[in-house]
Curated annotation (Swiss-Prot):
The keyword Thylakoid does not apply. It comes from Trichodesmium erythraeum (strain IMS101). SUPFAM superfamilies: FKBP-like, Triger factor/SurA peptide-binding domain-like, Trigger factor ribosome-binding domain. It catalyses: [protein]-peptidylproline (omega=180) = [protein]-peptidylproline (omega=0). The gene is tig. The lineage of its organism: Bacteria, Bacillati, Cyanobacteriota, Cyanophyceae, Oscillatoriophycideae. This is Trigger factor. The keyword Chaperone applies.
Length: 485
């Protein structure tokens, strides 16, 4: 067997494989023997079927196809080992299989060509002596005050409102459905996926939903139904909705205002396991300080990698891109399902191709960032030893508790993260990162989902007591008012 390699664009190689007459004959004879042993043909015992009867019954082309399939697969595997090819994904024939079957004659020479994606050869120049800027995230005591006020608001008593229109700061209970108007005449309007709810409770605060939605509810009266026109931001998290106009039909069913508790030890005990408000503040100060330090670390890491990516030379194979897109969409589906959203609506067979195409640029960018780290680590002989991987994996397993996980995937992720951490540390020592005030540099904004209220991450890590929003009925309010007269 003779193998000739040829480099192709996009990190592919082509193999021209020449097969000897002996190999082609042996492949054909092996298939004949296999079917003689296993074929069930009336009038003959297994293993006793005459050769000519078998060929007549199965058809010579069928037997040739089976023989050629085995022959090609075996030859490709031998070629991969013989030529030390670091293949990614599956080999793809450059000639139609049917054509190869047609030309295949057992006992005669033959040749075929196949191509395959291989590990990309990445080059990074000028990765030492760089100068980049990164935002320094500093702790501000206002973060604690804002968080406590938000929790205080949640623990407020809801008092029904009658006799006035909705105002900012109220709590509204509404039914709504969002419709994307048709762009062409005769086309039906499209209902917004996940943009429909009944008896949905919301705080009338700016920034909770897409611009225009909350503002449209302000001024509505009880039991009023109104159409509110809005537009999804151009950088909306769901790309298929970004920039599109939307009309919400909203019915205001109930309106309430909050009577807030005092910010004292009693409140601290209600919203956490801390006995005093001072202890809770101390915990929050430490937590937010740590978060800001971690954010600064992430900003520095991003700035370094962004700079190095500009010096990266690489052709990324299609197989890697498709795999990355698949992983990203799978993660998105998992995240959406945690909010109770039916992912089948988002990832239908009609929408999936478009979502894959929209995800592709980000997937390529992520791959470039990974390749930059891997390339520098290889150039500078930065490695992770087995003990480090084992220790970090055990930490992650403890955090996962009893959740199911893929141990091989876990090891891969842990190894990549440790290698990245070591490489970033090395790069910091061999370059300069200038810290600038937070908000100085451009950062990507995050737009909330239609029915999604994003909570502060620190909230889930505070030792919790009970969480209760006391709701007072209208008749109870009347009783209280009468007793005060």
């Amino acid at each position: 067997m003779k193998v000739t390699q040829e480099k192709l664009p996009a990190s592919q190689i082509s193999l021209e494989i020449e097969i000897s007459p002996e190999m082609s004959k042996n492949a054909y004879e092996q298939i004949i023997k296999k079917y003689i042993r296993s074929a069930n043909i009336p009038g003959f015992r297994k293993g006793k079927v005459p050769r000519n009867i078998l060929i007549q019954r199965l058809g010579k082309n069928y037997i040739k196809a089976m023989a050629l399939d085995d022959l090609i697969n075996n030859c490709l595997e031998k070629a991969r080992e013989q030529e030390s090819i670091k293949a990614i994904g599956q080999f793809e024939l450059k000639t139609e299989f049917e054509e190869l079957v047609k030309d295949f004659e057992p006992g005669k020479e033959m040749a075929f060509s196949a191509k395959v994606d291989v590990e990309p050869e990445a080059k990074v120049e000028d990765y030492k002596g760089f100068l980049v800027q990164a935002e320094e995230a500093k702790y501000d005591s206002a973060l604690v005050d804002e968080f406590l006020e938000e929790r205080r608001s949640r623990m407020g008593t809801l008092i029904p409102i009658e006799g006035r229109a909705a105002e900012m700061g109220d709590v509204a209970i509404v039914d709504f459905v969002g419709i994307i108007p048709s762009e062409t005449e005769g086309e039906e309007a499209q209902e917004v996926p996940g943009g429909k709810a009944q008896d949905f409770q919301m705080d009338l605060k700016e920034g909770q939903f897409i611009p225009g939605f909350i503002e449209g509810i302000v001024g509505m009266k009880l039991q009023e139904t109104k159409e509110i026109s809005a537009q999804f931001p151009s950088e909306y998290s769901e790309a298929n909705l970004a920039g599109k106009p939307v009309v919400f039909t909203v019915t205001l069913k109930e309106l309430k205002e909050k009577e807030l508790p005092e910010l004292d030890d009693d409140l601290a005990q209600e919203i956490s396991e801390f006995e005093t408000i001072d202890k809770l503040r101390e915990f929050l100060e430490q937590k937010f300080t740590k978060e800001k330090e971690e954010k600064t670390k992430q900003n520095k890491e991003k700035a370094i990698i962004d700079e190095l990516v500009t010096h990266l030379e690489v052709e990324i194979p299609e197989t890697l891109i498709k795999n990355e897109v698949q992983q990203m969409l799978a993660q998105s589906a998992m995240d959406l399902s945690q909010y109770g959203i039916d992912v089948k609506e988002f990832f239908s067979s009609e929408k999936l191709p478009e979502m894959q195409e929209r995800t592709r640029p980000e997937a390529i960018e992520r791959l470039k960032r990974d390749l930059v780290i891997a390339t520098v680590a290889k150039r500078e002989s930065i490695t992770v030893d087995e003990e480090e991987i084992k220790a970090e994996s055990q930490k992650v397993v403890k955090q996962l508790k009893e959740k199911d996980f893929d141990s091989d995937r876990l090891r891969q992720v842990v190894t990549q993260e440790l290698l990245k951490e070591k490489t970033i540390k090395w790069l910091e020592a061999n370059g300069t990162v200038e810290l600038v005030p937070e908000g100085t540099l451009h950062t990507e904004s995050q737009t909330p989902q239609t029915t999604e209220i994003l909570e502060t991450e620190v909230e889930s890590e505070i030792p919790q007591a009970s969480e209760t929003i006391v709701e007072v009925k209208a008749e109870e309010v009347a009783t209280v008012e009468n007793s005060q007269e």
